[in-house]
């Protein structure tokens, strides 16, 4: 028996910052690792709401165009200025408030202001002179292809779609399928790209946005040992605060949990797992239709199957007249 309890599970939005935060932390490195030019510099911005699917798709495209595409302008500008040995970006979605990051690795922590200045200067120039339309188009096509193909390798497609549902459903119970309905967005973005849409996104969310942070991670030798010592001291103090009976109960509970985890399930419990019956499986295999055509003297076989709008082309050549040493 139980009584229903009203639980407020809504995840609240973090309030925007009045100004960009400047945060410095240390991170552990091994003895002998260099301390000079081994910092991480990152510029991070909160981007709207995870429930805005079009905005999230657009920023995935924008991250590609600015930082991943060949000759990506922000990455190239930082590398040309020798800010770090590697530069990369990320757009973290699937959360209530996605964020966009630009990171320089193996950098000089004293060049933080230069790092930020180059990023902002490059973005301002893009807003003024326009995005590289080919990079935007390539990004849109790339993400549209991934969405259409939905290749999850060895993972079941239904399982992965079920996980994708939580990208919106966790934050709005009325929007479980928001991220499964993206096709129309790609067509819309192709049109908007020619109307200054992506330049406006840069101005609004990357240049005029104070809900952001500059994070510097500085290497420190021996930090891992310091943290381990602090943890050990904290645990020792906690143990000393316990009575003998409390310690014995913790030991007993731990043994009980380990035994519970290792014991085999009962037959009754195993029978509660839903299983497919033989009658649930279709005996008929999927039929493949081979429609044969002639195109300019070449035989073409067409298979009319569902591919979610993607055309797959395989070219087969007779190699009987090709010498063996030329066949890979």
Label each residue range with its predicted role.
Residues 2-52, 64-117, 132-160, 164, ...:
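Non-catalytic beta-strand/loop surface segments
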Residues 112-136, 170-258:
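Ordered core of a single globular domain
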């Amino acid at each position: 028996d139980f009584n229903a309890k009203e639980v407020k599970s809504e995840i609240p939005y973090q309030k925007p910052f009045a100004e960009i935060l400047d945060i410095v932390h240390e991170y552990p490195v091994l003895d002998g690792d260099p301390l000079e030019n081994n910092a991480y510099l990152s510029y991070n911005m909160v981007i709207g709401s995870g429930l805005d699917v079009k905005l999230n798709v657009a920023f995935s495209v924008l991250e590609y165009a600015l930082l991943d595409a060949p000759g990506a302008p922000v990455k190239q500008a930082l590398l040309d200025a020798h800010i770090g040995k590697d530069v990369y970006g990320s757009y973290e979605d699937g959360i209530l408030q996605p964020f966009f990051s630009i990171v320089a690795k193996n950098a000089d922590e004293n060049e933080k202001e230069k790092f930020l200045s180059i990023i902002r200067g490059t973005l301002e120039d893009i807003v003024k002179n326009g995005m590289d339309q080919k990079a935007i188009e390539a990004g849109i096509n790339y993400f549209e292809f991934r969405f259409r193909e939905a290749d999850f390798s060895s993972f079941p497609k239904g399982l992965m779609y079920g996980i994708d549902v939580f990208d919106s459903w966790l934050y709005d119970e009325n929007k479980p399928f928001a991220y499964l309905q993206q096709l129309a967005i790609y067509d819309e973005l192709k049109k908007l790209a020619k109307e200054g849409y992506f330049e406006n996104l840069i101005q609004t969310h990357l240049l005029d946005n104070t809900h952001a942070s500059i994070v510097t991670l500085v290497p420190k030798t021996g930090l891992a040992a310091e943290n381990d010592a602090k943890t050990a001291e904290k645990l020792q103090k906690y143990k000393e605060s316990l009575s003998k009976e409390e310690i014995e109960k913790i030991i007993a509970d731990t043994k009980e949990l380990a035994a519970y985890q290792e014991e085999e399930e009962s037959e009754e419990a195993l029978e509660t797992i839903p299983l497919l019956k033989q009658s649930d499986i279709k005996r008929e295999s999927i039929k493949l239709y081979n429609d044969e055509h002639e195109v300019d003297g070449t035989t073409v076989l067409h298979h009319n199957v569902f591919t979610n709008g993607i055309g797959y082309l395989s070219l087969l050549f007779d190699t009987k007249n090709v010498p063996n040493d030329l066949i890979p």
